A protein has these predicted regions:
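Conserved C-terminal structural/oligomerization subdomain of aldehyde/semialdehyde dehydrogenase
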Residues: 13, 111-235
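ALDH superfamily catalytic-core signature
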Residues: 1-121, 142-146, 187
Length: 235
């Protein structure tokens, strides 16, 4: 068997029914965990226009609560792994308008958690896995189609992600998950689906193949074979 965990662009959906304070707190943690350098980091946000302004304000407050007013002075805030990664991630700044963050320092490879809006959907920011603390934020509404249907159309039009995150009414989250495909995910949380060692983890499509953890790991990395032993006492 082949087991590949390949990453990808994991969407984060914020509906107007979401608890914005809790959403901001969990996303501030999930996006700054290792400065976004994790395979299942939330990659971009699809947010209902009615809660965008409140979320941006709450996200900024939660980042400060985690890392202090001067984030660059926080020795626990992770830097980019190397100069190439720093240059690649800061290069995304040109793909939209920064509405929060944007400070960086090449000497220490520091990049502040950054929200970017007005992003072209064919830009590198929206076509490459970010793997850093930069968060493109795309605003949707209920005009014409419902927010839910617009989210589904957007997600299924792109490669299947390694993770899928939804914040809002649980029943709506389950419906969106049923109508999309991803390696795994969370409703009203991020990252935590990987923490259960008894639950299978892996990607689908371009985000990977195969599953591991617990029994799935044993089966994935075991070779089974068929042997026939035939008697010779009669022929």
């Amino acid at each position: 068997q082949v087991v590949l965990e390949l990453g990808g662009k994991s969407p984060c959906i914020i509906d107007k029914t979401a608890n914005i304070e809790v959403t901001a707190k969990r996303l501030a943690w999930g996006k700054t965990l290792n400065s976004g350098q994790t395979c299942i980091a939330p990659d971009y946000i699809l947010i209902h226009k009615d809660v965008k302004e409140a979320f941006v304000k709450a996200f900024a407050a939660e980042v400060r609560a985690l890392h202090g007013e001067d984030i660059a002075a926080d020795r626990h805030y992770v830097r980019m792994v190397n100069d190439k990664a720093f240059e690649r991630v800061t290069g995304y700044f040109k793909d939209g308008d920064i509405i929060y963050g944007g400070r960086c320092d090449a000497a220490t490879r520091f990049i502040e958690p950054t929200l970017i809006e007005n992003v072209a959907l064919d830009s590198t920011l929206m076509t490459e896995e970010i793997f850093g603390p930069v968060f493109p934020i795309i605003t949707l509404d209920d005009n014409g189609k419902s927010f839910k249907d617009k989210v589904i159309d957007f997600v299924v039009s792109r490669e299947k992600p390694l993770a899928f995150y939804y914040f809002g009414k649980e029943s709506e989250g389950w419906e969106i998950i049923r109508r999309t495909s991803s390696g795994g995910g969370c409703i009203n949380d991020v990252i935590m689906h990987i923490a259960n060692e008894n639950a299978p983890f892996g990607g689908v499509g371009n985000s990977g193949m195969g599953r591991y953890h617990d029994k799935d790991s044993f089966e994935a990395f075991s070779h089974t074979r068929t042997i026939v032993s035939t008697g010779t006492w009669i022929d």
